[in-house]
Amino acid sequence: MEEEDARVPTLEPFRVEQEEEEYLLRQVFNAPKPKWTQLSGRKLQNWGGLPHPRGMVPERLPPWLQRYVDKVSDLRLFGGLPANHVLVNQYLPGEGIMPHEDGPLYYPTVSTISLGSHTMLDLYEPRQPEDDDPVEQPADHQPAPQPRPPPRPTTSLLLEPRSLLVLRGTAYTRLLHGIAAARVDELHATSLPPNAAACPSARPGACLVRGTRVSLTIRRVPRVLRAGLLLGK
């Protein structure tokens, strides 16, 4: 197995202090209303530009975000190049996001700072072709087939407030990731998350109640339109 393929999700030695967390949350919630986009199960802000297959039109990041983009870039997660895009997500208790992949518009590494509350990030194997096979219709007087159960995550990571998670290698390019729409996460002694040793709250039998969580997803968009192209030069 190649080194890149062996990489797994990690919690980097990067920590946001409580005062910094409070400052960042104030900046997020003080953003102009037009900056917010409401989706099913979350709302978000886009900073740095809107990624597009033909190239992202770059926008200057505000100083309060640029400081943390620089700190993450100093970890050299993006091939030695700086991050240039931040997606801010807000999740209320009971909200989540379906399993998905971030796709080819980004450098194959994603870093996420969690603020305000913990969550559980679920990782899934990609769907197989047989998962999409149509269900056969039952013959007359035969019981209807049972619906296929929803996919089960292969593992789940505890993301504590003020931590930085990094997904790269096959964890980014192959696995899907999502957040279950839950209000409480129960940690059982027999199934603690694999990163439990790095999480003070990951105690056997713990019942972690979710609050409002804000995530700063910091990435690099490789394809950026130059100013000359925008002006038609």
Per-region residue spans from a language model:
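Non-heme Fe(II) oxygenase metal-center motifs and adjacent flexible, charged/small-residue loops
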Residues: 1-233
